[in-house]
């Protein structure tokens, strides 16, 4: 009897061991299956990057621009940045995400469709690669938010709020969504092989060109080149610039859409580009004017960051050093040329910093992405890739110019003259447009 009981106990124990082993293997298979669907590490990084990129606009860019304008116009700039963040968010949910990343059918080379309007079909379990699609939607939304906010610097201190609002609504449909789709959403430029890691064309060239067109169309501010218009609060500008620098790590490294080697390299070269751009601008200004300025070093930082953006996922540290240095030097000269030689009042230098920087960075990507120059390598030869990059730059400039003018004309239909009156400009847009003053 005793031997029988012991034998039965051993049999039960062995059976339990086999069962536990099977359960362990089953759970491991389930875990592996889950890992194939979602990467918690990648998701956590893109969530963080999303917050960083939104932080670039609110409050980073708002403070950066706010400090650069005169004290009577600071609230207008903050209001424009804040309201655009809200407007673009609703538009993104309603139809912009669908236009940018949806299937456009016969027009897919240029624009997506409306099948995903109001995020139709999106659920908590929807996936985009190995991250939830909800995270991808939100990440891309932050890029859409900052682009029209950058344009604000081109017409600062002289455009009606109502005109700005309607213009931005139309511009996002006609310019941002199509270019975003063509580069990142499976459209023409991406299929051609254009290399734009984080928005040289989509964000910076678009914003720079639109700002230049608006600056020319609106005309110069009253007193431009005859009345001093110094920044009213450089401390605010430096605070905003610092926020932009930190937020840009999410902008560029987050565009890897993964917490991997590509993101690590993108973060490193982003920092190098910012630092080298700052110093290049500072030394060039120092040699020209005899003094290095705070405004100069932070503007050089933005130029370096904007220029490294399209290249950030493709180049190595030495390439970033060259790109950032060229950004500081060339964008500085572009700023002087536009303001002092051809007398265009791009109020906060959006085109020479972001437009020229985006063009320069997109073209230089073809060179420094090559393994010959320390890059991560590419399929095409340098010459072939350069032609693709050049086509992408020219195409984006032409598209943006044409449809920015269309957006201006549409805004004029609803608001008449886009510009505030001379009296309102003299009083300040804070009081005349918003009935408030930043300093009491």
Where are these regions (language model features)?
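Sec-dependent N-terminal signal peptides
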Residues: 15-20
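Single conserved hydrophobic/aromatic residue that forms the stacking wall/gate
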Residues: 1-12
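Glycine- and aromatic-enriched membrane alpha-helices
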Residues: 30-440
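A generic structural signal for short, solvent-exposed coil/turn residues
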Residues: 2-4, 25, 421
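C-terminal segment of classical bacterial N-terminal signal peptides
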Residues: 23-30
